């Protein structure tokens, strides 16, 4: 009955009657709903069921191969980017390339037959969106490739995506404007009137068919049954009852944490209620896909471009890329309001931005954003989030996450993000308790399992629970192929700190000798694993970091002539790892005091040698600890007197850098942190000086280990200062 598209056929495309077009439009909406359901299964930690659903759809006659290929590509993209494993990335790239090609063919076909499946946009628009989405995701995977040729191709793909997204976004704006004019004038367009079926005296409106039906179609029972089926699929998806769970409203909480989960009412709601007033129940599936897809892709693209270092950003601007972080964030936030995979990916991106391990919005740099007057902007009614809210979304982000937790109760991915949010709020013990509430061995997605264990280990070192952190991190050797060298080094650093705490009498344990032995073995053998079990054959930034550190430790041992290799290690390296993962912003006062004690009171031959470079690392970390403890001026004085003079000075009004390579990450980081000290001491009056420090941090070096991580943080801070000046 619904054999309309004839995918794979080489014959000329015939003209379709309205009845044939109506059937094709409903089939398209059905297949998109099926694909959205399949992707939601993955987000509920059931990738097998999602892929089986796509296999079932592919086997059916005249199914929409384009959306199925994209859905499969999105699933594989999520798996690949969660784990950064070469085979997974290669597999996802091939699928996304197929989706790109199919999208172009489907768009051309829809344009030729005039298949208007949207009341707002011209035929083929939805396939322009599937093309840009598959192109963008494919380009991101290509950027991770070590091939220069692939990286160059990725830039071209990004450029194509960028321009097509701009084109579609303009089409959306024009369509919305036209729609508002019609509403204002009171005119009615038959082409945009939902189809009405009339059978047995009852009427049913199908929002998926954007025009009036013929009298024969209105009474067609098969068409009606199909339209009702699609309506039912959408209703269940919007309520979260489409992937084997009861409606999500039953699990919706108002607060984070385990206690709030225990306080949920026991009585079950069976009605298909939506979680938010933002969800438009009258929106057609295809229109929803277009809106959310464009907002997500264009938003993420702009945020990524805005975070790139100036040198790369300048090159991209020449070929037409320009990124506005504020506009990008606003678009991603719009995408999250849609109850589909685009909204979920958008939320994951926002969680990484606001509460991820690097936290581009540094808690200590809490500058209030300027409120810009947008009253004269023709799009002002669409700007639902102002500058201050975009900067500090607070409860809005929390509620969005809690909705996803309700929608996907079986997913460890969303539980992990709740734990990250708790950690970001300094509720470290609660974060660990939440991660402990799930049996890690039962997490189906291996990449999510790895992330859960890694994040728990990071949180445990912020709590100085090094024994368990080491056990967690070593367990990843059997689960993850990311960086066995870093896992081994990390665990060794944990055992080193435990041994030192035993030495200082801060910890009583009969395992002191075991800690010493494990620390020595793991730290110094970690470098033997470099280049092995990484998602690229060349070493990762953190791999290069540990190689340099271990070589430093070995050189100091030889220089001092000490027998115990651990006596050649000055500043405890676990505190560097804690800084890289934002630990100083998350520790309680109790744990900050313990960190300060470990940094300043432990003694060994390497520390007593007062090596200038090791003292710099120690003094930098102590200054940050003091700032978080509220001793801001004292911390700033340490930075000014003991850290900055070793590589930075101002002579005759000009900045002079002393280029050092001993600890490349520390020098621009110290300049960045100096900007935060100025802000904390002088407030808004100190913003011009803060910006000067940030520009100095940015200008210290173009490329160094961890430069991407540090550079993005600096760039985000500069944009924040600029927004408030």
Curated annotation (Swiss-Prot):
Pfam families: Iml2-TPR_39. The modification Phosphothreonine is found at residue 196. Keywords: Cytoplasm, Nucleus, Phosphoprotein. It comes from the Eukaryota. One of its GO terms (cellular component) is nucleus. InterPro entries: Iml2/TPR_39, TPR-like_helical_dom_sf. May be involved in mitochondrial DNA stability. This is IML2-like protein SCY_3392.
């Amino acid at each position: 009955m619904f054999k309309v598209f004839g995918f794979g056929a080489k014959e000329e495309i015939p003209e379709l009657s309205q009845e044939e077009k109506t059937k094709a439009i409903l089939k398209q909406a059905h297949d998109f709903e099926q694909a959205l359901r399949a992707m939601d299964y993955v987000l509920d930690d059931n990738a097998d069921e999602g892929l089986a659903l796509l296999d079932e759809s592919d086997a059916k006659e005249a199914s929409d191969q384009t959306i199925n290929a994209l859905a499969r590509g999105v699933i594989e993209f999520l798996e690949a980017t969660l784990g950064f494993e070469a085979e997974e990335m290669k597999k996802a790239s091939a699928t996304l390339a197929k989706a790109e090609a199919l999208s172009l063919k489907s768009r051309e076909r829809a344009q030729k037959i005039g298949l208007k499946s949207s009341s707002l946009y011209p035929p083929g628009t939805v396939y322009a969106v599937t093309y840009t989405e598959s192109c963008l995701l494919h380009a991101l995977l290509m950027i991770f490739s070590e091939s220069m040729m692939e990286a160059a191709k990725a830039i071209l793909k990004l450029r194509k995506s960028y321009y097509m997204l701009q084109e579609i976004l303009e089409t959306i704006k024009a369509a919305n404007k036209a729609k508002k004019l019609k509403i204002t004038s009171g005119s009615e367009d038959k082409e945009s009137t939902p189809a009405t079926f009339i059978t047995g005296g009852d009427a049913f409106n199908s929002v998926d068919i954007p025009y009036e039906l013929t009298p024969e179609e209105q009474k067609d029972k098969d068409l009606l049954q199909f339209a009702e089926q699609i309506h039912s699929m959408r209703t269940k998806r919007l309520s979260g009852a489409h992937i084997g769970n009861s409606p999500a409203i039953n699990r919706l909480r108002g607060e984070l944490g385990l206690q709030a989960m225990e306080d949920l009412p026991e009585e079950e709601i069976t009605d298909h209620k939506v979680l938010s007033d933002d969800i438009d129940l009258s929106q057609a599936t295809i229109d929803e896909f277009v809106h959310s897809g464009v907002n997500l892709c264009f938003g993420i693209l702009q945020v990524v471009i805005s975070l790139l270092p100036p040198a790369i950003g300048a090159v991209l601007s020449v070929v037409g890329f320009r990124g506005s972080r504020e506009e990008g964030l606003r678009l991603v936030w719009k995408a999250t309001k849609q109850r589909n995979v685009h909204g979920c990916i958008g939320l994951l991106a926002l969680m990484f931005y606001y509460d991820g391990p690097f936290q581009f919005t540094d808690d200590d740099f809490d500058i209030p954003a300027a409120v810009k007057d947008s009253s004269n902007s023709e799009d002002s009614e669409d700007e639902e989030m102002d500058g201050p809210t975009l900067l500090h979304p607070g409860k809005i982000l929390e509620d969005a996450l809690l909705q996803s937790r309700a929608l996907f109760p079986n997913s460890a991915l969303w539980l992990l993000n709740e734990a990250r949010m708790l950690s970001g709020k300094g509720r470290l013990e609660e974060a660990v308790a939440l991660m402990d509430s799930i049996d890690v061995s039962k997490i189906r997605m291996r990449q999510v399992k790895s992330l859960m264990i890694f994040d728990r280990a990071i949180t445990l070192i912020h709590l100085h629970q090094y024994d368990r952190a080491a056990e967690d991190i070593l367990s990843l050797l059997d689960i993850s192929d990311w960086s066995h060298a870093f896992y081994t080094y990390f665990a060794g650093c944990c055992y080193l700190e435990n041994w030192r705490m035993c030495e200082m009498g801060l910890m009583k344990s009969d395992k002191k000798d075991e800690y010493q032995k494990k620390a020595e073995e793991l730290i110094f053998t970690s470098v033997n694993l470099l280049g092995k079990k990484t998602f690229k054959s060349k070493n990762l930034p953190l791999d290069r970091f540990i190689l340099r550190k271990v070589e430093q430790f070995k050189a100091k041992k030889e220089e001092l002539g000490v027998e115990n290799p651990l006596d050649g290690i000055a500043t405890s390296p676990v505190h560097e790892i804690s800084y890289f993962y934002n630990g100083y912003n998350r520790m309680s006062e109790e744990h900050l005091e313990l960190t300060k004690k470990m940094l300043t009171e432990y003694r060994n031959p390497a520390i007593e040698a007062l090596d200038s470079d090791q003292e710099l690392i120690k003094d930098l970390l102590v200054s940050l600890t003091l700032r978080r403890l509220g001793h801001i001026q004292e911390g700033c004085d340490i930075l000014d007197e003991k850290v900055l003079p070793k590589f930075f000075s101002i002579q005759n009004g000009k900045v002079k850098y002393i280029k050092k390579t001993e600890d490349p990450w520390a020098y621009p980081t110290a300049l960045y942190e100096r900007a935060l000290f100025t802000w904390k001491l002088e407030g808004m009056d100190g913003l011009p000086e803060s910006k000067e420090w940030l520009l100095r941090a940015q200008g210290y070096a173009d490329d160094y280990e961890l430069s991407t991580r540090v550079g993005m943080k600096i760039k985000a801070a500069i944009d924040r200062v600029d927004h408030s000046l």
